[in-house]
């Protein structure tokens, strides 16, 4: 069967692959488009396997909100250029829609979207990974995305505007816990040990150092907890004080940022990373 321009166009539309790749696949199968698609899918799987070792520390945080629940999903790629690609963004949206609909675990989402991920890796040429999914449930919810890289959901009993401002605060100030009382005892003990050591290095006796540290520990638990932090929009008051004034409460929050905890490859410029991603 002759390989016509119309056949190449159809294969491009069905696979999203480049024109030359489609033409080559059709020539190899004597114009059998179904066999060409099958071969291209196998080739895509091979490409995805080769890309799997590449560090994917860029990407996007997506948020989808439903009745009393919100889903946050992190999908990673290798470069911020691909993070803005319409195909990548569409994939991340599909994953997040599925997460909200089923409250699936990250492992379940990875299994559900593996075929689509492999096809996207073959098309884009970068490793892609569904890394995290988290859910927040509450009476009232507010969401905030700072660009594509930071996503926050806050749940509580308050008007949406107040919760939205708190979500913006969480994005900027990175609290680790909800209240000072929520800071785990082992975290407090470790920080106390560090602060006592600092005071003793300043020449204080251990007894005096331990007394000094009491004030520092109160400051520490405030700094790492949402309600104890100075509110970014009104720094003379804490978030807890602002909430009390409004008769509002926050029951939970989640903040995700692209690439948290991923060790990036050092020593390469962006151009070098792109060149490396394009090899093989």
Swiss-Prot record:
InterPro entries: EF-Ts_dimer_sf, Transl_elong_EFTs/EF1B, Transl_elong_EFTs/EF1B_dimer, Transl_elong_Ts_CS, UBA-like_sf
Gene Ontology CC annotations of this record: cytoplasm
Pfam families, A to Z: EF_TS (PF00889)
Cystine residue pairs: none
Primary residence: cytoplasm
Residue segments, region Involved in Mg(2+) ion dislocation from EF-Tu: 79-82
Keyword Protein biosynthesis: yes
GO MF: translation elongation factor activity
CDD domains on file: UBA_EF-Ts
Subcellular location as annotated: Cytoplasm
Record carries keyword Zinc: no
Assigned keywords, A-Z: Cytoplasm, Elongation factor, Protein biosynthesis
GO biological process: one example: translational elongation
PANTHER family per the UniProt record, alphabetical: ELONGATION FACTOR TS, ELONGATION FACTOR TS, MITOCHONDRIAL
Record's function text: Associates with the EF-Tu.GDP complex and induces the exchange of GDP to GTP. It remains bound to the aminoacyl-tRNA.EF-Tu.GTP complex up to the GTP hydrolysis stage on the ribosome.
Family, per entry: Belongs to the EF-Ts family.
Family annotation (NCBIfam families): tsf
Full protein name: Elongation factor Ts
Organism encoding this protein: Vibrio cholerae serotype O1 (strain ATCC 39315 / El Tor Inaba N16961)
């Amino acid at each position: 069967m002759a390989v016509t321009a119309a056949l190449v166009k159809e294969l491009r539309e069905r696979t999203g692959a480049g024109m030359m790749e489609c033409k080559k696949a059709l020539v190899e199968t004597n114009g059998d488009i179904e066999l060409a698609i099958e071969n291209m899918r196998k080739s895509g799987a091979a490409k995805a396997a080769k890309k799997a070792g590449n560090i994917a520390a860029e990407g996007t945080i997506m948020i989808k909100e439903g009745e009393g629940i919100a889903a946050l999903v992190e999908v990673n790629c290798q470069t911020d250029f691909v993070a803005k690609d319409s195909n990548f963004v569409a994939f991340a949206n599909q994953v997040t829609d599925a997460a909200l609909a089923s409250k699936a675990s990250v492992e379940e989402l990875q299994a559900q979207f593996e075929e689509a991920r492999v096809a996207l890796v073959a098309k884009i040429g970068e490793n892609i990974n569904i890394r995290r999914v988290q859910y927040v449930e509450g009476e009232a919810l507010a969401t905030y995305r700072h660009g594509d890289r930071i996503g926050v959901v806050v749940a509580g009993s308050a008007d949406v505007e107040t919760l939205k401002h708190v979500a913006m605060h969480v994005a900027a100030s990175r609290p680790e816990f909800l209240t000072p009382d929520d800071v785990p005892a082992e975290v407090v003990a470790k920080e106390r040990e560090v602060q006592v050591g600092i005071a003793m290095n300043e020449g204080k006796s251990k007894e005096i150092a331990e007394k000094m540290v009491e004030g520092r520990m109160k400051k520490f638990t405030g700094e790492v907890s949402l309600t104890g932090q100075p509110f970014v929009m009104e720094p003379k008051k804490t978030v807890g004080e602002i909430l009390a004034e409004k008769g509002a409460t926050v029951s939970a929050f989640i903040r995700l940022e692209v690439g948290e905890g991923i060790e990036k490859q050092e020593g390469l410029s962006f151009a070098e990373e792109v060149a490396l991603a394009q090899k093989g």
